[in-house]
Amino acid sequence: LYALIELYAKTYDFDKQAELWEDLIQIDKLNNMYYIEAIYCYMNLGLFKKALKIVQKAEKNIAKNENLTILKSEIYQRDNKIERSLEIILNAHKKNPNNLNYLKKLSELYILKSEYILANEVYTKILDIEPENPTALLASFKIFQTQSLLDQEIDVFLKIFNSISVTKEQKIDILFEIFSDNNKIERYKNHIPTVLDKCILTYPDEVMFYVVLGDYK
């Protein structure tokens, strides 16, 4: 069966793959991976009701778990039923408020709904648990920029450049964004030398930071 699944995977035949994963579920009803693979196949086919049936079967045979909860939410999201998707994650979050995966999914759904204040509240919770989470840092930075909350924006800006989790490329992108706008240069002028010095210490072989610092001074 595995050989056939590999063959169908190469041809993107999700229908046949789903059938085989369901056959494997009948052989081993306690194997979580079989359910998840079948669910993804049906999601790729746009067969969301079938995907939900597999989730229900997994919850019955294995019990509810984090992966299944997030997958269930994703099925509704892919089916453009965002409110139902959000409801599932909110219920899970209430039972386990410090679960990072639920928080990440919750922030993603709030962004989809353009509810940026709620999304930022979730990012703040993520950063309380995982202070160097790059997604939360970068997203919070963008939200504070759009809301013109300068103190919070500067605070997150400095955290980004002190973080080893935010990549060099992401930091360069932020600097390019700032240096392409005179208003932003003015806004960050007291902090630019500090963050550039930090970048040079962290990435001594990256010429870009030396050039930008030289031009700025």
Name every feature range the model reports, one short phrase each.
Residues L1-K217:
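Alpha-solenoid helical repeat scaffolds
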